[in-house]
Amino acid sequence: MLACASAGPAFADPAGIWRDKDGGTIRVHRCGAALCATIASVEPRLDPTTGQPWTDKHNADASKRSRPLIGVQVLSAMQPNGGGKWSGTLYDSDRGQTYAGNLIELGPDSIRIEGCALGLCGGEELSRVVK
């Protein structure tokens, strides 16, 4: 999947809770002058394979695979990178990999999180739940 986006004007502070297309949420917060984010909820709540709460089972680091997915940091050190764009590190819990990533403000209640590897970029739009 190839996704292209250009940074637009800066909107409201992107800190808050954001919902993805599957109903899960992340909590974006300040970490110094940067932005970070952690998983706040997942949907469905239980892993259908195990019947238990989701864990970080795809993590490349085997010692982290049994940790609860809720609370896992998914955005790190996101620094301002032009009008409404923040760039840093993205952890993809579906693949257990870390990539260069961006948080792009699309509007006051909409952001796009995207990551790139080997020149291919993909991402997802999220909607604001709580500021």
Regions inferred by a protein language model and the residue ranges of each:
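Residue-level recognition of beta-strand termini and adjacent short loop/turns
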Residues: 82, 107-109
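N-terminal helix-cap/turn-to-beta initiation motif at the start of protein domains
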Residues: 9-17, 121
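Short, exposed beta-strand-loop hairpins at the edges of beta-sheets
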Residues: 100-103, 110-124
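Structural motif
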Residues: 31, 106-107
